[in-house]
Regions:
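PLP-dependent aminotransferase class I/II
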Residues: 3, 13, 27, 56-62, ...
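Structural detector of well-ordered beta-strand residues that form the stable sheet scaffold
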Residues: 74, 99, 120, 173-174, ...
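PLP-dependent aminotransferase-like
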Residues: 88-180, 184
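Hydrophobic/aromatic ligand-binding patch that stacks against planar heteroaromatic rings
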Residues: 111-112, 165, 193, 210, ...
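Conserved active-site segment immediately N-terminal to the catalytic lysine
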Residues: 175-212, 242-246
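Active-site PLP attachment segment
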Residues: 196-232, 239, 256-259
Length: 398
């Protein structure tokens, strides 16, 4: 078993001479884009176009066009609000159940409880970590009104299975696409961009996302014009026009400054994704070179492109992940765990959710062993070589 005490930080003193490695390098990205970002900020300041306005409208249309979504995009305050807006627009509320994967960020299930419905946790696929369609079916009940499909880490869940299943049972399919914006599903039955394959889709522009703002932001997307209009109304206090409120909504508007900054990044979208894919390919090659036999690399879904929001490996069973992380940190190599605790084990849901009868053993196993390596647009081959070499050294000593 790996023992952190057998690897003192002094062994890695030479690492301080290397270029720093960041888990996410927003500083490097923004330095490259700084002139364009500054110009966008100056324009918004000069126009005082802070709430909604032309920059938001422009960004919504450009996102729709650039990613060939073929629908309607409504900006909002953040990715969590986007999920809540989608559920509210669909009329999900008390007495309803919403199936969610047990392995995700808390907002996926949090918004279900917020609208008064019951989250029902289903298990995940052991290879892709996406919602397992068979477990989703076992979680279904007469009260099931929606399923929240999370496209995790940069690729799509099994939409060839999930979309027809949801349609067969009259279940709304909401895509939580915070991590996989730009991914495309091309199955024999279902084809299209992530976020536009179900009833509604959502995304997040949190700064570390592949398309990140310099603050919070999110969006809801759908092919249904009426649903889009309701989302826009709900996000603006339920108002159809100023001081005329058709329903009780709340305040969740994408602001003009963030929209202008997102427009800058959208101009560089293809390059940003190409850099992530190149970094993932380098990790693949490096892991092949050192002949890891017990480390599981990220699986690629058969019919999905991958935008690599994260590059997550599975450590061997029994590995002391905490010790591995600490020793890597001492060597100047950051890592992260997405996610350490399945949602069904979170105290927040102790009384407000239920879990599929067969449990979620895969989600619990993955949560114990998953490890995210640095992944961003500024990664170099030298950085990645250090990451893999040090990881191999540590695991080889166990």
């Amino acid at each position: 078993m790996f023992n952190a005490s057998s690897h003192s930080p002094s062994e890695h003193a030479a690492g301080a001479q290397h270029e720093p490695i960041h888990m996410v390098d927003l500083g490097g990205l923004h330095a490259r884009l700084r002139p364009e970002l500054d110009q966008a900020i100056d324009q918004v300041l000069a126009e005082s176009s802070f709430i909604r306005g032309k920059h938001v409208a422009s960004f919504e249309q450009r996102l729709n066009d650039s990613l060939e979504l073929g629908g309607h995009v409504v900006g909002c305050g953040n990715g969590t609000d986007a999920l809540a807006l989608a559920l509210r627009a669909l009329g999900v509320g008390p007495e309803d159940e919403v199936i969610v994967p047990d392995f995700s960020f808390i907002s996926t299930a949090e918004v279900v409880a917020e609208v008064g419905a019951t989250p029902v946790f289903a298990d995940i696929d052991p290879a892709t970590f996406q919602l397992d369609p068979a477990s989703a079916e076992r979680a279904r009940s007469p009260r099931t009104k929606a399923v929240m499909v999370v496209h995790l880490f940069g690729q799509c869940a099994d939409m060839d299975a999930l979309v027809p299943w949801a349609e067969e049972h009259g279940i709304h399919l909401v895509e939580d696409n915070a991590q996989s914006l730009g991914a495309v599903w091309s199955g024999p039955r279902i084809q299209g961009p992530a976020g536009m394959l179900g009833t509604m889709g959502t995304t997040s522009f949190f700064p570390s996302k592949n398309l990140g703002a310099l603050g919070d932001g999110g969006a809801v997307m759908t092919r249904d014009a009426d649903l889009a209009a309701r989302v826009r109304r709900l996000s603006n206090h339920g108002a159809e026009r100023k001081y005329h409120h058709l329903e009780v909504g709340f305040n969740s508007r994408l602001d003009g400054l963030q929209a202008a900054l997102l427009n800058v990044k959208l101009t560089h979208w293809e390059d940003l994704i190409a850099r992530r894919r190149a970094a993932a390919a380098r990790y693949d090659a490096l892991l092949d070179d050192v002949a890891f036999t017990e480390v599981t690399r990220p699986a690629r879904a058969a019919h999905s492109t991958h935008t690599f929001h994260q590059y997550c490996i599975l450590l061997p069973v029994g590995t002391d992940r905490t010790a591995i992380q600490q020793t890597l940190k001492d060597a100047g190599i950051p890592t992260a765990v997405y996610y350490p605790t399945p949602l069904s084990s979170q105290p927040a849901f102790a009384e407000s959710a239920r879990t599929v009868r067969q449990g979620t053993p895969v989600a619990h196993d993955v949560a114990r062993r998953i490890l995210a390596l640095p992944m961003h647009t500024e990664l170099t081959e030298a950085m990645q070589t250090r990451v893999v070499a040090e990881l191999f050294r540590l695991l080889s000593s166990t």
